[in-house]
Amino acid sequence: AVMELRRFNSKDFLKFHPGGELGAQLARVSDFMHDGDALPLVGADMPMSDVLITMTSKGFGIAATTREDGLLNGVITDGDLRRNMGKLMAMKAGEIANPSPVTVTPDLFAAQALALLNDRKIGALMVVDDQGKPVGVLQIHDLLRAGVA
């Protein structure tokens, strides 16, 4: 009742108590995603040898293929690399990328993203804006380390 009188809402609680259990539950994907130069973005026509370098240097175990307009075209994971190992170096990124990857938006609650990662048994996923442009990558380890449950 006092919180309502003072117009103190969940966003205010998160701002003043970000390290607490409730604060972790109120956090958004945008609070944990890696963005900017950290994004593992590759062109669909990129040779897999170059994709491997990008995936290794970025360290997320995932790479996103993008179209010329910058929209997400697909995602390549470590599992995709293992499944295509025999012919990997003769392929291009777009031939391996999953064209229907699991994605989230920056405004999704981090706890919901964690549940999705757990349900799908994946360690990372791409964060896209409302138009489908990659704006971040989210790793399960970052959420667990922060106490999101």
Report residues per predicted region.
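Short alpha-helices
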Residues: 1-7
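Generic structural signal for well-ordered, non-membrane alpha-helical segments
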Residues: 6, 22-25, 44-48, 110
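Oxyanion-binding "anion nests"
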Residues: 31-71
